């Protein structure tokens, strides 16, 4: 399949978006999971980590708890990342297609689409985050995902899996709106034709992840505290904020910022580049049909994927059309038209068929005019 055909393919097919999103989500979390474990350990208050960077934290985990400690709990992420990211990207693309019909403001479109995608994604990923972070904690007693789920449910009930859901939404709504807006911004600047361009997808994804992660780190610290506590004594964002401030001061809200940014940059780069690749690849398998994300109905092949148009772009097109019409009108009035030319030819032809008379025949050949020599011999 030609790369130039990428944006004319059925890029909003629900099946394509869900499949590409699931693969991208699993690959992202599997590759970056060890660094995510380091981030969780640096943000944890039990035991408190002081003046520890990424390298020293990772070294301590491996030395004290074994080589496989940084990847414990990865299976929970794999189980949750697939369906969560599948619905995440499908909801984003579907909402973006729908809102484009009602607004021409691009950033508003991205914000609304990102918010809807986040609500659906977090409803699925919140329980897996709790399991993952419990297994990432220092001296965690859990050796498997199943034992972790059973123990949490037995001791704390089902609500423990959604204890930080509100905080997670408060964190992820601004995170994802910044994420999607930044990604689409760099796409519009670096990839004007919106074609399949792996370097641009990776660069835009990395920039989006870095910006979103840096801004929302304090909320991530609060979420980590709520997810990792076993007693459930700390309830809500306000109480968690007070506890963090009391134990670590103002800087406690920014613990693990470097690890979070370094995690998010490659993670989002991997996620977006993988998603765009599989969307590009899977579209090529059914390039002649376009299935709407909203209705699911098949339509003829989509001519082009066009971003929501702004008022400035529409005004420019209108001015161009008006200029073309003006030039056409001026040409018709200033130069002989094909109609006038054909009329002149018709008139000349009629003159050639009329009988000879006093009127001069413009088509009379010079041989028809007799010379004096010829007139002398005429009878």
Curated annotation (Swiss-Prot):
Role summary: Mitochondrial iron transporter that mediates iron uptake. Probably required for heme synthesis of hemoproteins and Fe-S cluster assembly.
Pfam families, sorted: Mito_carr
Gene expressing this chain: mfrn
Lineage top rank: taxon: Eukaryota
The protein, known as: Mitoferrin
PROSITE patterns in the record: SOLCAR
SUPFAM superfamilies listed in its UniProt record: Mitochondrial carrier
Primary location: mitochondrion
PANTHER family from the UniProt entry: MITOFERRIN-1-RELATED, MITOFERRIN-2
Localization per Swiss-Prot or TrEMBL: Mitochondrion inner membrane
Transmembrane segments: 14-33, 73-92, 108-124, 164-183, 198-217, 256-275
Topological relation to the membrane, as annotated: Multi-pass membrane protein
Entry keyword set: Ion transport, Iron, Iron transport, Membrane, Mitochondrion, Mitochondrion inner membrane, Repeat, Transmembrane, Transmembrane helix, Transport
Cellular component per GO, a single term: mitochondrial inner membrane
InterPro entries from the UniProt entry: Mit_carrier, Mitochondrial_sb/sol_carrier, Mt_carrier_dom_sf
Record has Magnesium as a keyword: no
Placement of Solcar repeats on the sequence: 12-98, 105-189, 196-281
Disordered: region residues: 357-379
Family listed: Belongs to the mitochondrial carrier (TC 2.A.29) family.
GO annotation, biological process: iron import into the mitochondrion; multicellular organismal-level iron ion homeostasis; spermatid differentiation
GO MF terms, alphabetically ordered: ferrous iron transmembrane transporter activity; iron ion transmembrane transporter activity
Species of the source: Drosophila melanogaster
């Amino acid at each position: 399949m030609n790369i130039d055909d990428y944006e004319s393919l059925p890029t909003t097919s629900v099946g394509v978006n869900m499949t590409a999103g699931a693969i991208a989500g699993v690959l992202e979390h599997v590759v970056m999971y060890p660094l995510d474990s380091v981030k969780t350990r640096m943000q944890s208050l039990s035991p408190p980590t002081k003046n520890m960077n990424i390298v020293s934290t990772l070294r301590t985990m491996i030395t004290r708890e074994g080589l496989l400690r940084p990847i414990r709990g990865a299976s929970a992420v794999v189980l949750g990342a697939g369906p969560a990211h599948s619905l995440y990207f499908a909801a984003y693309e579907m909402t973006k297609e729908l809102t484009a019909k009602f607004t021409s403001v691009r950033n508003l479109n991205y914000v609304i689409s990102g918010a809807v995608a986040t609500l659906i994604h977090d409803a699925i990923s919140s329980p897996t985050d709790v399991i993952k972070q419990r297994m990432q904690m220092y001296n965690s007693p859990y050796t498997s995902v199943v034992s972790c789920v059973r123990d949490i449910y037995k001791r704390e009930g089902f609500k423990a899996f959604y204890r930080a859901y509100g905080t997670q939404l408060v964190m992820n709504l601004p995170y994802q709106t910044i994420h999607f807006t930044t990604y689409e911004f760099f796409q519009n600047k670096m990839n004007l034709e919106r074609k399949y361009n792996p370097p641009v997808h990776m660069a835009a994804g990395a920039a989006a992840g870095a910006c979103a992660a840096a801004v929302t780190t304090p909320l991530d610290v609060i979420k980590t505290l709520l997810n990792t506590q076993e007693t459930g004594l700390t309830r809500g964002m306000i109480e968690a904020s007070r506890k963090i401030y009391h134990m670590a001061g103002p800087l406690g809200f920014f613990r693990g910022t470097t690890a979070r940014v370094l995690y998010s940059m490659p993670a989002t780069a991997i996620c977006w580049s993988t998603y765009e690749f599989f969307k590009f690849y899977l579209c090529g398998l059914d390039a002649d049909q376009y299935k709407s994300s909203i209705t699911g109905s098949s339509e003829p092949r989509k001519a082009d994927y066009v971003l929501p148009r702004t008022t400035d772009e529409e005004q420019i097109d209108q001015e161009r059309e008006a200029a073309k019409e003006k030039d056409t009108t001026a040409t018709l009035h200033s130069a002989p038209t094909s109609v006038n030319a054909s009329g002149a030819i018709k008139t000349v032809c009629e003159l050639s068929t009329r009988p000879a008379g006093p009127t001069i025949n413009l088509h009379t050949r010079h041989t028809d005019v007799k010379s004096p020599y010829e007139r002398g011999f005429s009878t």
